[in-house]
């Protein structure tokens, strides 16, 4: 009877796929290890990488008849469980698992799944049933189970069969080789190096306009639109390409030889005579740096002119060493004088015509604007969340010598994209929430590069204010500001990279049961990058959108496009509409202008409060989302509606002080300490030293802050927080209200302040 079982078992084994039969050789080798130490296994994957691979549910055996029981009898579940437990605890089993790519985490998951499969299945596959029966009868060896376990493990974790392929797909060590057409050329690389207001971009643009064909790649829609307008005004037909629209310089569907585009929309398949890449220092940006890297490596152009700060030169030269190209450097000096004043502003009473007060949060924008207008001075307001038309209107109002508006309050959104006639830049604060390369929010002093970029906006060439001035609002910030502006920007060390849609599609082919967010995590953790030149850009915003629409059935390519949408995830209404649009698209239902109108509250009304204004800004972003997707039929109608909405928002911003008053009036008796909290912030602004992290360490190292002073500041901070908490308890509705976002949409992160405060109390 035992010989019969052995013959049947052997027949079953020979009918297995070659990969499973080959595993028996490994099992045989393992039997020689009973009394010997295990052989060294291959290098294990990091635990955090293994945990990213989600187990696949294994389907039960589909055979209706229990052939195994008919041949060798039924299996006792209790005996079967003993065999499985013994199998999983064997040193030789674990050694074989390691040799086949299963680390401790994957072993645990696979053992558990295999055990449940064997115990809970009504009918086991006949060959596995016979193997278990032989072991129970003493005619088989427990290691005979391993080939079946390994087959099960590879079903649960499909990546075990394709790990080498996954690593090859995510090998990003030589991104220059991705662009074969660009590598086929011997490109002339010209770096126009200089500070703000030095004329570097002007000289690059002159070469662009004189070329037969050209492309301008800018960081903002405003800059691309400005180049588009100037080129056409000078008689050089030029098209405009941004994420939301395409405009033709000649006629519809008749492309011009020149293109002005945002850097993400740059074509790396079209040949040009001249390409201009503006603000090249953004190649280090944790979120968008990949777009500059792609443009610099991939543009098919005889001449590539890059403009930016001197700190980018060394990195560009190193990258060009990998492409066999050299960099010609043209240096420019600032065209106008810039003086750092010896005294701080001290009070808003000292604001003068031509002043621009730079804040790093919307809350500061609102409160400073109101305080200045309370002194009888009209204010222009610019921050990142405003539509482009509103920004331009506010800039024109401020620049017009005949206009009564002589003061501007803005965020660092003015650092790029707007021509402003500013006499003096005043830093209201030197502390800004930022995001590091790990995607963590932290509060730190503004960088040298950012400070120079903003300060350089003062004293523009050929304006009424050719001599620029810079100072701080608070006297305690002035010395720090002077020290920052006396430095040169640190050399850039790395350029950003990002997974492409093609790479993620290949990952999805190998891991069909993984979500898009999960695929991105696996890619980032498995990828290999040349750390001396490149880094992987932060993908948290992409993953946030991917997880939001994970339950919506969409093709992978469409899902990827949706997740690339430039959405501010701090705006609940925008996120809600994003989800609605994705659902509508997945059902193959038309996403029309009527759909947008019905969900966005058309027709629009003039805002009466700041909350109304913030909502209208969100609606504008939703319309941008509609046009960005390039998947929907009525983009033209939505664009016309955006123009109308832009004008309404402009009127709201022109009357921002009245909106603030209305907001406070509507909240009286409901959230009284909300206004109090805002006023307290203005009267007693946070000191830079109150933040934890690198800033505190830097001040301690420089001797500007002693441990004793730090201890006293912490006590004072804690006392203030206790006082605010006590005041907050007097309002029963405080927790039910949702006050306006306290940061600039594009440039700061309010959650960082709140998070830091909580840490401080601890």
Curated annotation (Swiss-Prot):
One of its GO terms (molecular function) is DNA binding. Its cofactor is Mg(2+); Mn(2+). One of its GO terms (biological process) is mitochondrial RNA 3'-end processing. It catalyses: ATP + H2O = ADP + phosphate + H(+). InterPro entries: DEXQc_SUV3, Helicase_C-like, P-loop_NTPase, RNA-DNA_Helicase, Suv3_C_1, Suv3_DEXQc, Suv3_N. PROSITE patterns: HELICASE_ATP_BIND_1, HELICASE_CTER. The keyword Hydrolase applies. SMART domains: HELICc. Residues 716-762 are annotated as: Disordered. Residues 721-730 have a biased composition (Polar residues). Residues 181-321 form the Helicase ATP-binding domain. Residues 739-748 have a biased composition (Acidic residues). Keywords: ATP-binding, Helicase, Hydrolase, Mitochondrion, Nucleotide-binding, Transit peptide. Major helicase player in mitochondrial RNA metabolism and maintenance. Likely component of the mitochondrial degradosome (mtEXO) complex, that degrades 3' overhang double-stranded RNA with a 3'-to-5' directionality in an ATP-dependent manner. ATPase and ATP-dependent multisubstrate helicase, able to unwind double-stranded (ds) DNA and RNA, and RNA/DNA heteroduplexes in the 5'-to-3' direction. Regulates mRNA stability and is required for the correct processing and maturation of mitochondrial transcripts. This is ATP-dependent RNA helicase SUV3 homolog, mitochondrial.
């Amino acid at each position: 009877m035992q010989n019969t079982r052995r013959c049947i078992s052997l027949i079953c084994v020979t009918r297995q796929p070659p990969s499973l039969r080959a595993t028996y050789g490994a099992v045989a080798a393992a039997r020689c290890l009973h009394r010997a130490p295990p052989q060294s296994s291959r290098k294990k994957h990091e635990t955090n990488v293994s945990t990213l691979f989600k187990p696949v549910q294994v389907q039960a055996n589909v055979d209706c008849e229990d052939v195994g029981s008919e041949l060798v009898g039924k299996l006792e579940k209790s005996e079967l469980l003993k065999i499985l437990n013994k199998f999983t605890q064997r040193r030789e089993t674990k050694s074989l698992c390691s040799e086949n790519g299963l680390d401790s985490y994957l072993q645990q998951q696979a053992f558990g799944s295999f055990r449940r499969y064997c115990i809970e299945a009504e009918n086991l596959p006949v060959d596995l049933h016979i193997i278990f029966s032989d072991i129970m009868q003493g005619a088989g060896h427990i290691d005979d189970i391993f080939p079946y376990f390994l087959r099960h493990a590879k079903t649960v974790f499909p990546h075990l069969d394709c790990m080498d392929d996954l690593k090859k797909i995510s090998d990003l060590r030589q991104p220059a080789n991705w662009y074969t057409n660009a590598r086929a050329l011997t490109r002339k690389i010209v770096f126009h190096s200089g500070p703000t207001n030095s004329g570097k971009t002007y000289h690059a643009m002159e070469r662009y306009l004189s070329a037969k064909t050209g492309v301008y790649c800018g960081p903002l829609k405003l800059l691309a639109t400005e180049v588009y307008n100037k080129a056409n005004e000078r008689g050089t037909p030029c098209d405009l390409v941004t994420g939301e629209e395409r405009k033709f310089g000649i006629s519809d569907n008749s492309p011009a030889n020149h293109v002005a585009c945002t850097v993400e929309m740059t074509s790396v398949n079209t040949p040009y005579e001249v390409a201009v890449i503006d603000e090249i220092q953004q190649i280090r940006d944790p979120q968008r740096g990949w777009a500059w890297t792609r443009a610099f490596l991939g543009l098919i152009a005889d001449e590539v002119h890059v403009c930016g700060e001197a700190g980018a030169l060394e990195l560009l030269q190193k990258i060009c060493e990998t492409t066999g190209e050299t960099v010609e450097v043209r240096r420019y000096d600032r065209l106008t004088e810039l003086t750092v004043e010896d005294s701080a502003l001290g009070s808003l009473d000292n604001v003068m015509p031509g002043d621009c007060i730079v804040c790093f949060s919307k809350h500061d924008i609102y409160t400073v604007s109101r305080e200045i207008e309370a002194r009888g001075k009209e204010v222009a307001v610019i921050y990142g969340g405003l539509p482009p038309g509103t920004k331009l209107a506010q800039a024109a109002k401020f620049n017009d010598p005949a206009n009564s508006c002589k003061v501007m309050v803005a965020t660092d959104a003015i650092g790029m994209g707007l021509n402003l006639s500013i006499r003096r830049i005043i830093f209201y604060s030197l502390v800004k929430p930022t995001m590091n390369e790990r995607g963590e929010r932290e509060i730190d002093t503004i960088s040298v590069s950012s400070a120079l970029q903003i300060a350089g906006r003062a004293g523009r060439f050929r304006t009424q204010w050719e001599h620029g001035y810079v100072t701080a609002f608070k006297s305690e910030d002035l010395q720090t500001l002077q020290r920052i502006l006396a430095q040169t920007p640190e050399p850039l060390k790395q350029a950003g990279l990002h997974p492409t849609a093609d790479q993620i599609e290949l990952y999805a082919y190998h891991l069909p049961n993984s979500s898009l967010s999960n695929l991105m995590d696996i890619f980032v953790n498995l990828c290999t990058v040349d750390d001396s030149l490149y880094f992987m850009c932060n993908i948290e915003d992409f993953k946030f959108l991917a997880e939001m629409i994970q339950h919506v059935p969409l093709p992978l390519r469409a899902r990827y496009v949706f997740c690339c949408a430039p959405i501010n995830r701090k705006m609940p209404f925008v996120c809600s509409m994003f989800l609605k649009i994705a659902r509508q698209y997945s059902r193959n239902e038309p996403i029309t202008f009527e759909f947008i109108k019905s969900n966005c509250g058309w027709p629009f009304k003039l805002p009466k409060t700041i909350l109304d204004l913030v909502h209208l800004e969100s609606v504008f972003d939703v319309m941008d989302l509609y046009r960005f997707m390039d998947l929907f039929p009525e983009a033209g109608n939505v664009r016309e509606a955006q123009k109308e909405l832009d004008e309404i928002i402009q009127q709201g911003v022109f009357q921002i002080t009245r909106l603030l008053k209305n907001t406070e009036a509507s909240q009286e008796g409901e959230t009284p300490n909300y206004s109090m909290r805002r006023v307290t912030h203005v009267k007693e602004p946070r000191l830079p030293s109150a933040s934890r992290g690198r800033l505190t360490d830097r001040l301690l190292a420089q001797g500007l802050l002693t441990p004793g002073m730090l201890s006293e500041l912490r006590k004072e901070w804690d006392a203030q927080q206790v006082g605010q908490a006590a005041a907050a308890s007097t309002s029963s509705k405080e927790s039910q209200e949702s006050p306006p976002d306290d940061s600039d949409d594009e440039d700061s992160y309010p959650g960082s302040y709140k998070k830091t405060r909580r840490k401080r109390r601890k």
